[in-house]
Amino acid sequence: MPAYDKADLERRMHGAVEALKSDLTGLRTGRASVNLLDPVTVEIYGAHMPLNQAATVTAPEPRMLSVQVWDRSNVGPVDKAIRSAGLGLNPIVDGQTLRIPIPDLTEERRKELAKLASQYAEKARVAVRNVRRDGMDSLKTDEKKGEIGEDDRKRRETEVQKLTDATISDVDAAAAAKEKEILGK
């Protein structure tokens, strides 16, 4: 059975792009986004769990997040988790609701976040190139085993390269859009 599997390569490359998009949603841009709190985990009942399993997060205003905690006894741990998440947010406790004003980003912080977005994009590019290398290696293996001919290998290598180029362009587009959003240009 041939080692080359185009569908697997596509799935893995798509996974790298999705991982990048997930990483980028966690970067604060100065506007309220419910995704901003996705990386926050809360210690409740002796276990760590994502914030969205203990509360409902909404963005009632462009510069305000609201976190409605389901169990009153968990308000303290949720407040602590948000403050210690490294997002620079300071919740205001109002009963079972935490109101989180989104502060303006300083120019220096914007540049740091843009640089971080670039690092995430480079990590995704490396992942895509690693998938490409795996695909090329499996094609060479198939040719050595005699399962495909040289012409077939070259044609499929061209397919893999086109897939790689398209995926890298998706990565670049996602990173450029996030950098533009962060820098406010």
Swiss-Prot record:
One of its GO terms (molecular function) is ribosomal large subunit binding. The keyword Chloroplast does not apply. One of its GO terms (biological process) is cytoplasmic translational termination. Pfam families: RRF (PF01765). It comes from the Bacteria. The keyword Protein biosynthesis applies. CDD domains: RRF. GO terms for cellular component: cytosol. Residues 136-161 are annotated as: Disordered. Its main location: cytoplasm. SUPFAM superfamilies: Ribosome recycling factor, RRF. Keywords: Cytoplasm, Protein biosynthesis. It is found in: Cytoplasm. Belongs to the RRF family. Responsible for the release of ribosomes from messenger RNA at the termination of protein biosynthesis. May increase the efficiency of translation by recycling ribosomes from one round of translation to another. NCBIfam families: frr. This is Ribosome-recycling factor. It comes from Rhizorhabdus wittichii (strain DSM 6014 / CCUG 31198 / JCM 15750 / NBRC 105917 / EY 4224 / RW1) (Sphingomonas wittichii). The gene is frr.
